[in-house]
């Protein structure tokens, strides 16, 4: 039900608000607080607290309202939660001119503190969703999200990428919180994290994300670019400019960022003062914060959260309600819980992999060129023993070449790439053996010679057994001779036309097994292997008849 109340809130001052509350959850504002909805476990897996999300996003007052999701992300210990609490003050007191509150009032809301260790983990959402009237009279729900800082000492790169990407995918306004400047590594990390988010989303011709705001804290160069949005716009234009004299890598980073976000802006914020930075007991009282910071803070927060600045969350051009946002939250986290996406890698690991793969490619290419000189297409047949000797020598040279290349990652990291090189060289050697054998005139004639021998033997046996009256054996030999003759003609056609090459390979394998000078067991094994490998070809060539009664063996004629 709707309630109008004048409450003393924890951010200082009285405010009169009209809010919708479900009959099940009539709680005063002061009991609202941060709720962790994305939990990063000790094993670096992710868990979504669906029950908490349901309570927040499916309350009767907001579930069918279009939602504005505001998120703050960036490196850890850079004041994200501190900033979020000033956003809360504004949301609770925005109708008041002096919304920042009493100068002696401690700052409360999302948990924050000074120091060097992380405070926020996962993703936290403020438990009260604010209902705000936009300029066109439409009432929208505003959701505030605080995120775990990136690159702390307890998180993997995948943890940081997932939290940043997920918050960017869910939010309609993403505040990228940076300290002192926008450096090239900040842009590269943004490129990595947004690409990790784009991978998890459906492909679309639209830009996947909405508003990105670079918030540069502790800005120390107001004489170059003034504090605020105007100075930030000029600064960002220069920083994200793509020019022809830039390296291709730098151009790609900037093009990628522009391709991901519909709106990109920047705000330059001064340092809050030495008392804030050095006092271990600082609790957020405005009286201890520099006036220049407070002055620009009063500009920044309304610039972000005033009704005309709110961007309704859209996905593929469709406006999303709180109910819909809940479903997207569930769908996205399932993707990151699985193994469908590649794990992001550190710059060292990615460089080391590229380094080792390049060394593998160089060594493999060297082996290939030397083998081509020995038994390439225009070279004559080489004795198998000589070919094997050359192979072993060149393989050893390639391994030495790989070991001699300076590679990042160390010996242990390079070991699996050495194994990969040896495996790929062995595969190439098998291909060279086949290529070399094809030049042997006796090898090329093996199949027709074998089939001719089979035809001759079965012809002789059929003649002898027919002469002495063993008609069944004679008929069987005649049948084998006929099938062999058909096989020979088929093989000749395949060699001439180049069609049905797989069937030709089967015939060659069977002939090779019959030709084999080794033991009978080896020949039978080769026959069995050929049959098992190409069984589907036999089934296509000789389809089994549909259920018919078994024919009785042909009786001997009297």
From Swiss-Prot:
It comes from Rattus norvegicus (Rat). The lineage of its organism: Eukaryota, Metazoa, Chordata, Craniata, Vertebrata. Residues 1-34 are annotated as: N-terminal hypervariable region (HVR). Its main location: endoplasmic reticulum. GO terms for biological process: axonogenesis; endoplasmic reticulum membrane fusion; endoplasmic reticulum organization; endoplasmic reticulum tubular network membrane organization; protein homooligomerization. It holds the Pfam family GBP. Residues 1-449, 493-558 are cytoplasmic. The modification Phosphoserine is found at residues 10, 22-23. This is Atlastin-1. The gene is Atl1. The modification N6-acetyllysine is found at residue 395. Its EC number is 3.6.5.-.
């Amino acid at each position: 039900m709707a309630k109008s109340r004048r409450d003393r809130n924890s951010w200082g001052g009285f405010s009169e608000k009209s809010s919708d509350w479900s009959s099940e959850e009539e709680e005063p504002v002061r009991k609202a607080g941060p709720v962790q909805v994305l939990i990063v476990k000790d094993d670096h897996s992710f868990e979504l607290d669906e029950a908490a999300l349901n309570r927040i996003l499916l309350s009767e007052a907001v579930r069918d309202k279009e939602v504005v999701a505001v998120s703050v992300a960036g490196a850890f210990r850079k004041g994200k939660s501190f900033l979020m609490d000033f956003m809360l003050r504004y949301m609770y007191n925005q109708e008041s001119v002096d919304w920042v509150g009493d100068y002696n009032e401690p700052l409360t809301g999302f948990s924050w503190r000074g120091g060097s260790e992380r405070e926020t983990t996962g993703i936290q959402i403020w438990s009260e969703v604010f209902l705000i009237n936009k300029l066109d009279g439409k009432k929208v729900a505003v959701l505030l999200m605080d995120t775990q800082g990136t690159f702390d000492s307890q998180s993997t790169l995948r943890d940081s990428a997932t939290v940043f990407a997920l918050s960017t995918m869910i939010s309609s306004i993403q505040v990228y919180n940076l300290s002192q400047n926008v450096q090239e590594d900040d842009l590269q990390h943004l490129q990595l994290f947004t690409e990790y988010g784009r991978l998890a989303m459906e492909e679309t011709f639209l830009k996947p994300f909405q508003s990105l705001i670079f918030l540069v804290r502790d800005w120390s160069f107001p004489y170059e670019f003034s504090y605020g949005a105007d100075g930030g716009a000029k600064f960002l234009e220069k920083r994200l400019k793509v020019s022809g004299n830039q390296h291709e890598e730098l151009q790609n980073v900037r093009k990628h960022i522009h391709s991901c976000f519909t709106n990109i802006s920047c705000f330059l914020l001064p340092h809050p003062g030495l008392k804030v930075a050095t006092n271990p007991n600082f609790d957020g009282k405005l009286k201890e914060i520099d006036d220049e910071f407070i002055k620009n803070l009063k500009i920044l927060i309304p610039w972000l959260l005033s009704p005309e600045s709110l961007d309704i969350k859209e996905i593929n051009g469709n406006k999303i309600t709180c109910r819909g946002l809940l479903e997207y939250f569930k769908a996205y986290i399932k993707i990151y819980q699985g193994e469908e996406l590649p794990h992001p890698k550190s710059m060292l690991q990615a460089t080391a992999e590229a380094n080792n793969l390049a060394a593998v490619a160089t060594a493999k290419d060297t082996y290939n060129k030397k083998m081509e000189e020995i038994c390439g297409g225009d070279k004559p047949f080489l004795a198998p023993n000589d070919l094997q000797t050359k192979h072993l020598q060149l393989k050893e040279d390639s391994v030495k070449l790989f070991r001699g290349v300076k590679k990042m990652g160390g010996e242990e990291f390079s070991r699996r790439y050495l194994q990969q090189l040896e495996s790929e060289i062995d595969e190439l050697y098998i291909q060279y053996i086949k290529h070399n054998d094809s030049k042997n005139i006796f090898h090329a004639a093996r199949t027709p010679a074998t089939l001719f021998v089979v035809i001759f033997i079965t012809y002789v046996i059929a003649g002898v057994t027919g002469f002495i009256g063993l008609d069944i054996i004679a008929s069987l030999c005649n049948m084998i001779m006929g099938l062999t003759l058909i096989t020979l003609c088929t093989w000749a056609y395949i060699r001439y036309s180049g069609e049905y090459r797989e069937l030709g390979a089967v015939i060659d394998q069977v002939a090779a097994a019959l030709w084999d000078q080794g033991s009978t067991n080896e020949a039978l094994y080769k026959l069995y292997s050929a049959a098992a490998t190409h069984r589907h070809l036999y089934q296509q060539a000789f389809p089994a008849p549909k259920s018919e009664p078994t024919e009785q063996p042909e009786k001997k004629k009297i």
